[in-house]
Regions:
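N-terminal Rossmann-like dinucleotide-binding module
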Residues: 1-45, 49
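Short active-site oxyanion
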Residues: 6-8, 33-36, 83-86, 244-248
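Donor/substrate-binding cores of folate-linked one-carbon enzymes
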Residues: 24, 32, 85, 89-192
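Short, structured coil segments at secondary-structure junctions
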Residues: 53-54, 103
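Short, well-structured alpha-helical segments in soluble
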Residues: 72-80
Length: 321
């Protein structure tokens, strides 16, 4: 079973979304642990709640500091806690580009509108003034542009005829408390999701020259060459033949390399029951910590072992430049 993801939450005030995430983390099947709650306001009410729940806290005021300097202080605290993801929960600071880059694809935010509508402030009144029938909230990845990152999930909230900004905000907040923990859990556990893992392999395998996908004994495999005479260079395996792991099968140069890999890192590599005797190696991908650059390298290496010479010659020539 994969280790739980480690997250840090940034707040500036009472932290109601923080509280929802904290209480969700108490469930035994929650895929994340909260390592730190940090704030730019030492008096933020949410810090007291986090402390009461035995969660480490950190605070450092931003006044008198450049945006970059304060972000670096926060970054250092997050890294020091061991967190792998940053969750913004009412953190009222525009983050520097450098901070955003450091946490690219590992930082989430929740926004009280159905993005891309109504980025920024006053979202409730803007939705009412526009005559919208529904408003809502969105969880998205954080990018350099405000409220512009890829949307991971949304919840619609009906706008009632007598709604004002406050009444609408109170119902959207309830939706936020449901949406944020659920979306966070889904996102941090995606690397253990077989469908997500398969798509990562597929994208990388099909990016190689003259490749195509074909089922083999019910499992997706990738071949190089023509439909009739192509050769397999990789397979996806999902707990087949009594094996417990989700993995990628690739070719090695032979028994010596296979044995060396198994001896050097038995937690990563294993001998597949079906093709192990043929010199193939399996790489575990359901640990939640897959190194996808490493996987790309293996796919390329395995591809070169079976690709037609005309293709490998082209690769060799290209590598000279």
């Amino acid at each position: 079973m994969a280790d739980k993801a480690k997250i840090a939450i940034l707040i500036s005030g009472r932290g109601s979304n923080m509280a929802a995430i904290i209480y969700a983390a108490k469930s035994s099947d929650c895929p994340y642990d909260i390592m730190l709650v940090a704030s730019n306001d030492p008096n933020a009410a949410g810090l007291k709640l986090a402390e009461a729940e035995n969660i480490a806290t950190f605070a450092h005021p931003h006044k008198g500091l450049s945006r970059e300097a304060h972000d670096q202080i926060m970054h250092d605290a997050i890294v020091g806690s061991g967190a792998e993801y940053v969750v913004l929960a009412g953190y009222m600071r525009i983050l520097s580009d450098g901070f955003v880059r450091k946490w690219a694809d590992h930082m989430l935010n929740i926004h009280p509108s159905l993005l891309p509508k109504y980025k920024g402030l006053d979202t409730y009144q803007r939705a009412i003034d526009a005559g919208d029938k529904v408003a809502g909230c969105s969880v998205h990845l954080v990018t350099a542009e405000l409220d512009d990152g890829p949307v991971l999930a949304q919840t619609e909230v009906a706008i009632l005829p007598d709604d004002d900004a406050d009444s609408l905000a109170s119902r959207i907040l309830i939706a936020e408390h449901q949406l944020y923990p659920a979306t966070l859990a889904q996102y941090v556990s995606r690397e253990c999701n077989p469908d997500w893992i398969l798509q990562q392999i597929r994208d990388r395998a099909l990016a190689l020259a003259e490749t195509h996908e074909r089922l083999s004994f019910g499992s997706p495999g990738w071949r190089v060459g023509g439909e009739k005479n192509g050769k397999y260079f990789a397979y996806f395996t999902q707990r087949l033949y009594g094996e417990e792991s989700i993995g990628l099968l690739v070719k090695t140069s032979g028994p010596d390399e296979q044995a060396a890999l198994l001896g050097a890192d038995p937690d990563l590599y294993y001998s597949p029951k079906f093709l192990g005797k043929s010199g193939w190696i399996a790489i575990r991908l359901d640990t939640g910590r897959a190194d996808w650059d490493h996987i790309s390298d293996w796919l390329g290496k395995s591809w070169q072992m079976v690709a037609p010479k005309r293709l490998t010659k082209m690769i060799a020539i290209a590598d000279q430049f």
